[in-house]
Structures are given as C-alpha cells and as structure tokens.
Amino acid sequence: MEINPYLMFLNNDVTSLISTTYPYTGPPPMSHGSSTKYTLETIKRTYDYSRTSVEKTSKVFNIPRRKFCNCLEDKDELVKPTGNVDISSLLGLAEMMEKRMGEGFFKHCVMEAETEILKMHFSRLTEGRQTYDWTSERNMPAATALQLTVDAIKETEGPFKGTTMLEYCNKMIEMLDWKEVKFRKVKTMVRREKDKRSGKEIKTKVPVMGIDSIKHDEFLIRALTINTMAKDGERGKLQRRAIATPGMIVRPFSKIVETVAQKICEKLKESGLPVGGNEKKAKLKTTVTSLNARMNSDQFAVNITGDNSKWNECQQPEAYLALLAYITKDSSDLMKDLCSVAPVLFCNKFVKLGQGIRLSNKRKTKEVIIKAEKMGKYKNLMREEYKNLFEPLEKYIQKDVCFLPGGMLMGMFNMLSTVLGVSTLCYMDEELKAKGCFWTGLQSSDDFVLFAVASNWSNIHWTIRRFNAVCKLIGINMSLEKSYGSLPELFEFTSMFFDGEFVSNLAMELPAFTTAGVNEGVDFTAAMSIIKTNMINNSLSPSTALMALRICLQEFRATYRVHPWDSRVKGGRMKIINEFIKTIENKDGLLIADGGKLMNNISTLHIPEEVLKFEKMDEQYRNRVFNPKNPFTNFDKTIDIFRAHGPIRVEENEAVVSTHSFRTRANRTLLNTDMRAMMAEEKRYQMVCDMFKSVFESADINPPIGAMSIGEAIEEKLLERAKMKRDIGAIEDSEYEEIKDIIRDAKKARIESR
C-alpha cells in the first residue's frame, strides 16, 4: 500500500502545517570571514535606490553628499524599491495620525518620555551588547566602551562628574568641538634580554598603557563611525547580511529617540512593538475583532501578509528628522534639541568597511587579503564582481570608512520606523470614502499585515494599489512577489500564525523537550514544566502533550541508562541497580532514575514525581533519597532551558531536592611533570586552537590546560598542606618527615601497580 502525503491535509489545518516546514532541529549556520562584501552591497543599494544624482560637497568632510529627500528623478519601473522620501507627504500622514488619536497626542507622549529621560542614569548605556569603541577602533562590550569614553574625557579635560543621561549627552556635544582629544591606549613594547645559559637574545612583548591624542577632524570621523559585521545564525539564506553597531557617542541620543518612540508605540493599537508574547497576541486579536465592528453588511475584507523589500536601505535619517520635528512641535525646547541630534548624526555617518577582500589565484593555491584602506590601490587585482561594487563608491571612501548620508543599517531605530509604518495605516482621503473603502493593519518594524476592506473585487484591487502608492511616497516598498492575500482572519505576523485565533508554532519549542543534561533530579521535572507551559499557551493539545511526555521519558532513560526494573534490559548500570532493587518491597515507590515507572499524567504535570511516590516508598528507601546530609544532595534556584531560537531561557527550578540532585565538578588540576615538556605540548595545542579560531571566528573553544591523574593531585595537595602546617607550628618536623615517607610509599605502590 502506498502512503499518500496529502492525507495530512484532511485532519490538520493549513496554518499549523506551515510550522512543520521550519528547519529548526539543528543549530543555525554561522557566518565566517570578512564582512566587507556585504557592507559594500548595502551601501551600493542605498545609493542606487535614491534614484537621483543631486549632490553637494559636504562642508565638514569635503566629500560629495547625495540628497535623499524631495528629489526623485528616475521614475522608470517604480515597482522596484525607491528610497526617495517626499517630506510633505510624511508630515501629512503624521498629521492624520494625530487627528485620529486625538489632539495633543504627541505632546502627551513626549512629556511622558521627558520625565523618564530626566531621571535616567547614563549607566543605562551599559545594557547593550557589542559596541564600537572609537579609541581602539574595534568592537568591545558596552560597559568597556563606555568606561574608555569616560576615561578619554578625564585625560583631556579632567574627571567627568555627571550622573544623568542629559549631562552625558551635553558632554558628548562639547566633545565634538574639542580641538584635540586624548585617550588611553595599550601599546606593546618589545624588550630584548640576553639568556645567561645560551647567550642568545630573547625578545619579549610587554603591554604598556600609554596616552594617545587625535585632532578634531580625525575624532569627528571616529565618533560618527558605525561598525559592521556579518549576521550570525540565519536560516534558509545563502547570502549573509551586514548588521551594525554604533559607537558610544551616538548611543545616548538614539536611546532618547527610542524612548520617545516607545511611548508612542505603546498607545498605537496597530503597533506590534514594544510588547511581546501573550500580551502581543491579545493586542493583535483586539485589532482584528475591532475590524469586524467597523465593516458594513455589504463589505468584505482581504488579509495581506506583507513583506517589505529592502526596508533598511530605504529609510532616511532626514525623514526621521522631519518626523521628530513634527512630534516635538508643542514640546519643550530641551526635547526639540535632544531629539534632533540623533538623526543629524546619522545623516553624516561613516560606515566601517571591515577586514577587506580576500583574493586567490586561478589554481586556488595562494590567498591574499586586500585591506580596506588599500582597495583603491589594488583594484586592478579584483574580480569583476568586486570591481562593480567598489568603483561607483570610490569617491565616498576615505581610508577604511565610507560616507553614507542616507539609509539605515540593521537594528537602528526600530520603534521610530514602526511609527512611520503605522502612519500609512491611518491614511484616509475623500476618494476612498466615496468608494466605501478603507484599510487598517498591524506593523512591527519591517513586518506588516494589511486588512483591505471594500464592497467588490475591483475596489479591493484599487485599494491595495492605493496603499502601495501611499507607502512609496515615504520610502516603504511593499514587495509584490513576496506578499500574498488570503481570506479574512488567516495571516502570519512576526512568526505568529493566525487562523481565527493564534495557532501554535510547536517547532520552535522542540529542543526544549529534550533532556537538559543537568542531573537526574532536575531533567525530567524541567521537561514536564515546559509541556505544562505549552499546554497553558494553547500550543499543545492533550494527546500531543501525552506523546511529548512519553518521548521525554524514553530519552531520559536512554541518557542515564536506567530502564524499568522488570524490563530485563542488560547493562553495566542496570546490574548494580537490579541488585539494589531486590532489597525493596514496594516497587511502585521507585523513582524513574532508580528503575521505577512513570506515575505522572497530563493532570499531574505540575507535581514532581517524588511527591507522588512519597507515600508508596519504603521507609528505608525514603530516608536514603531525602537525606539532607548526603554529600550528593544539592539545590539550584534556577535552571537554563535551551530553545530553537532566541537566548537561553532561565526558569525557576521546581524539582524536589533528593540524592539525585547532584552537581558534577570538573577536575582542573595541572600536570605534575617536567614543566618544559608540558609547556611544549601546550604550545602545540594552543597553536592548533588558534588556527581553528582564526578560520571559524564564532567557534567557542576552551584551550587545553594539560592533564593529571587524581592520585598525583591528592599527593601534591597533601604535601602542600603538611608543609603549611609545619610552617605555622601545628605539627613538628618529625611528623612532617613521616607524612613525606607515607606519600613516597604510596607513590611507589601506585607506579608498580601500573
């Protein structure tokens, strides 16, 4: 009999089947090597989508500066993306949005943000992850980058005494006017010494903390530089993308703009940010149900699951400046000034090009890297692909940075771009009213859903085209190939599938159902708590939850090699366990980790198995399992849970403390042999590790630190303790000599037994 795969569609709805197509079972692919190519592609796309050649020479940097707003020249094939924003249309949309939300809506939001900003401490900037550090010109953790910037102020002008975000912002604006900036930098000095034995000269590198200084022009470029790197962990894509991290001089201003935008997003019912999880689902459900109330009896809706092409390349900082000017028009002068700084800095940004371009000869036997600074000099060596990327941008490149007045890089101003997107969803004009059409939707950064409402199909077509035209005016390009329309209440939004209600995407949670590998006590309880959480969220039906529980049990038994006492499974561990089980009368009270059977079902998922089996245990067995003085008994408050996407989730540990709650420790003692031989061995290991790390930059390798048997480690420790006791006078010399003799005899016996 042949199996027909289409039978799956009979029992399952389409939206739940979509979730099975995600390849979430393995780890996502990592990106290796130089990010220069991806960065050049992003910059070239931004210049191409401007569809204009209007340029002026920048007075500050003496580089040609392209205009990205109000100057659309190339009007051919407008289906393709365009990044030229019409400012008057943008302000008109913002006005419509304020009218719909009520008079003084923006003013109220900015006042809320202002009270928060005035209290904000500048240490909030340490929350970020990797940040570009302008002193060393590479990425650092956010806290380190902030400390180095504060140190630079100290070296140039004296200690920085401010505490609030505003004082820090003022200092940054002052810094941009300084004629010279001094900062700390680690330099390596080469020291030469002669070896007494061999007479050879030995070179050693010594790190020395020095003070460096740069002039105003150089500092301006460094302050406005945004570093780029290739994005890690992207599924289903052959080409990588570049993501960006700004420096500590731009960060505080963008933080302020995002705070203002967040207050606006919280009050917009079409916005998918800043809430998440179940709260987000409830907000979206309200928007969908309110649509039905607005529709007349002769109207019908079509849902469009939209996809915006090249969102970041078509966003313009100049447009953001105009939008923020409108938002803060009735606010205090302080907020007007503060909100205008970030877009102005982004209008003059420099993008760091990365490590450079790798070239090889025809036979692929030799490889060479052309650094970013020398690309202009050696462009005759480049392939056609790289030449076409580099030559149009050559006039904008200075050393290893490129001037980019337009466009946003990934991860900047997520909230503000959502406000921009929602403003298109609030649009209404006389022509739409006359035809009895309107639209609404949901927006979350570059992801959107459109609900188009009309009375017949031709009007629906016209409404969607109208929406597309409104979006084009402010640089939002709806991709006609990737967007698709469907019947009402059937769409996908930010990986959430909606079909009358939200359908679970179980594939995301699959890795969390497996054995965590902490210890026998915690693992099964953790898996049960995940199944329970997913049942509460409507992600698992009762039958699927039961199946998941059985799979967890099988994997738990396979991991710890413990099988039911009557299963007759043979194995080294089962031999020992079976001998111990013979002494127990009531075998129903045995824990799973001791060869017992599963007692939990779906209704008792929240109760740990130790509690369920407590009454059935033999008294002697119970006293052994719950013995607080047992050295294996240990309790951790939290437990780490791995998921297919996103960071590791930390949850509360609900497991009962028993003798199975042990914690394994690593033996980190050093090799007690001739030091020289060990050093040589370590050097070889270190070399291999370094080679591997240089190829796979995101690999996490712990370099080996030698090996030592436990016997040697104990002997070494005993001698050390005895010597210390003798030195403080706790034991006499004769006792110390006796201890040494005993250890020597033990060492001999150990070596002979080998």
UniProtKB/Swiss-Prot annotation:
Subcellular location as annotated: Host nucleus; Host cytoplasm
Major localisation: host cell
Post-translational modification (record): Phosphorylated by host PRKCA.
Biological processes, Gene Ontology terms: DNA-templated transcription; symbiont-mediated suppression of host gene expression; symbiont-mediated suppression of host mRNA transcription via inhibition of RNA polymerase II activity; viral RNA genome replication; viral transcription
Entries under Pfam families matching the protein: Flu_PB1
EC number(s) from the headed UniProt entry: 2.7.7.48
GO cellular component assignments: host cell cytoplasm; host cell nucleus
Family, similarity comment: Belongs to the influenza viruses polymerase PB1 family.
Protein name: RNA-directed RNA polymerase catalytic subunit
Source species: Influenza C virus (strain C/Ann Arbor/1/1950)
